[in-house]
């Protein structure tokens, strides 16, 4: 079943699959699990706590506490769910629990305070009660949202606060009378004081006004003298500036007159110089014309011959340049051909070297693969023969045909020497009563008969003994 809690509620789930208690806003409730709902809304608890001060004066302390689960602390919610949620928030059980904590802490606190301290220090007293009660409520996951301590009330038969109120009223009335008398006295004294101060201030202001008027008159005279002096100084400065300007003007007029005369003289001299220059230019041009005419007459033939020689020399130079360029082109072509031949030779050798390197790499890889395979083969043999290295060696020698090769070498060595050959036999043959079933084993028996002399011959030639599992050599004395 799927359960969903309201905004101010929590689901408390216990049972199968849950170690202790689980709080959720919404959850599936499976068989074997139990689910209850508790409300988080705070509740107002109103109490009239009867307490006694340090002077043994009883009084009643009306108070209203707004208390509910602490929603911002998961551990407090767990405590509340376990301890308080099974009971109704308005039940006598919860009410008595909260009232007992508040009354107990309030009585303990009031017992250490005088009535005057409680009456006058209401704010501090309220904070002390709040802190101590909250400390106890933390055990149940409860939180004080608000605490209001009302006015202290007398216990029937004890009129302390009534008398204290009357005392306060009388003190207030007497203080009011004193305040009225003091106010009247201060009013009359203040009135006379204000009249005297008014007359004094008026005389003082008149004297200060006369002094200020004299000061202002003197300052005005000073300012007039200062202004007249400044005007005279300014007039003198302007007259000096005018005289200086007139002097500068006279100097400039004299300079301008002299400059005009010099300019007229320079202009006259410049005209004469220009006239002489033009005359010389005319004469020079006439001389140049005569010279050019003579050059044209005497040098025309030489110029033609010179141009002809120059053209011939240029043609010879052009031919030689072209021949040199042709030779250079041939040399370049030959060098490029040699370079191409060298590149092709280098490429061919490079390819051969790479092919040889590739073949060597593959051969090495094959050798490594073969070695790994042989190693695995030998390791398998060794494991199969119980790590008997001697048996593995003998097997490899037999499997590799080493004994046959030794026999062949020995046969080649004694060929033509007529060696002694011993033949072992048990004397039986087909005519000696051997059955047809035993004839098939004749060849095998012949091989076994031949092994002892073969082992003996191998031992005589190499000094090696056959393995124990294949047999032993015959006794030398037999």
From Swiss-Prot:
Swiss-Prot/TrEMBL induction comment: Not induced during nodulation.
GO terms, biological process: nodulation
Location(s) in or outside the cell: Cell membrane; Membrane, Caveola
Gene3D superfamilies: Band 7 domain (3.30.479.30)
Lipidation (S-palmitoyl cysteine): 35
Function recorded in the entry: May act as a scaffolding protein within caveolar membranes, functionally participating in formation of caveolae or caveolae-like vesicles. May be involved in nodule formation.
Name of the molecule in the record: Flotillin-like protein 1
């Amino acid at each position: 079943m799927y359960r969903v809690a309201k905004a101010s509620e929590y689901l408390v789930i216990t049972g199968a699959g849950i170690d202790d208690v689980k709080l959720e806003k919404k959850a599936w409730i499976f068989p074997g699990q139990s689910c209850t709902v508790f409300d988080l809304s705070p509740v107002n608890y109103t109490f009239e706590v009867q307490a006694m001060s340090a002077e043994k004066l009883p009084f009643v302390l009306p108070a209203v506490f707004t208390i509910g689960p602490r929603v911002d602390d998961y551990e407090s919610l767990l405590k509340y769910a376990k301890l308080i949620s099974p009971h109704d928030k308005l039940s006598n059980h919860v009410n008595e629990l909260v009232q007992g904590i508040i009354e107990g802490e309030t009585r303990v606190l009031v017992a250490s305070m005088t009535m005057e301290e409680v009456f006058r220090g209401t704010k501090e007293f309220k904070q002390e009660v709040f802190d101590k009660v909250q400390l106890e409520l933390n055990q149940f996951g409860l939180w004080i949202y608000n605490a209001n301590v009302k006015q202290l009330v007398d216990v029937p038969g004890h009129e302390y606060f009534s008398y204290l109120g009357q005392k306060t009223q009388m003190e207030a009335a007497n203080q009011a009378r004193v305040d009225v008398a003091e106010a009247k006295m201060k009013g009359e004294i203040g009135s006379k004081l204000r009249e005297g101060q008014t007359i004094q201030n008026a005389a003082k202001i008149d004297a200060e006004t006369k002094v200020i008027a004299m000061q202002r008159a003197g300052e005005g005279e000073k300012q007039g003298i200062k202004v007249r002096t400044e005007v005279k100084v300014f007039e003198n400065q302007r007259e000096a500036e005018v005289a200086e300007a007139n002097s500068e003007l006279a100097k400039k007029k004299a300079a301008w007159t002299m400059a005009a005369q010099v300019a007229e003289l320079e202009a006259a001299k410049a005209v004469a110089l220009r006239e002489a220059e033009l005359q010389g230019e005319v004469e020079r041009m006439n001389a140049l014309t005569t010279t050019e005419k003579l050059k044209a007459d005497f040098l025309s033939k030489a110029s033609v011959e010179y141009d002809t020689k120059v053209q011939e020399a240029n043609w010879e130079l052009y031919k030689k340049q072209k021949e040199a360029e042709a030779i250079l082109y041939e040399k370049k072509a030959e060098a490029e051909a040699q370079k191409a031949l060298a590149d092709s030779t280098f490429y061919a050798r490079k390819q051969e070297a790479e092919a040889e390197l590739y073949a060597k790499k593959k051969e090495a890889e094959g050798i490594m693969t073969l070695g790994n395979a042989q190693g695995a083969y030998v390791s398998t043999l060794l494991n199969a023969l119980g790590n008997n290295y001697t048996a593995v060696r003998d097997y490899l020698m037999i499997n590799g045909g080493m004994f046959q090769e030794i026999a062949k070498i020995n046969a080649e060595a004694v060929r033509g020497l007529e060696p002694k050959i011993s033949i072992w036999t048990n004397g039986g043959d087909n005519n000696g009563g051997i059955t047809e079933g035993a004839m098939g084993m004749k060849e095998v028996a012949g091989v076994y008969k031949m092994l002892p002399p073969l082992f003996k011959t191998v031992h005589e030639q190499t000094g090696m003994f056959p393995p124990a599992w294949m047999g032993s050599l015959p006794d030398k004395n037999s």
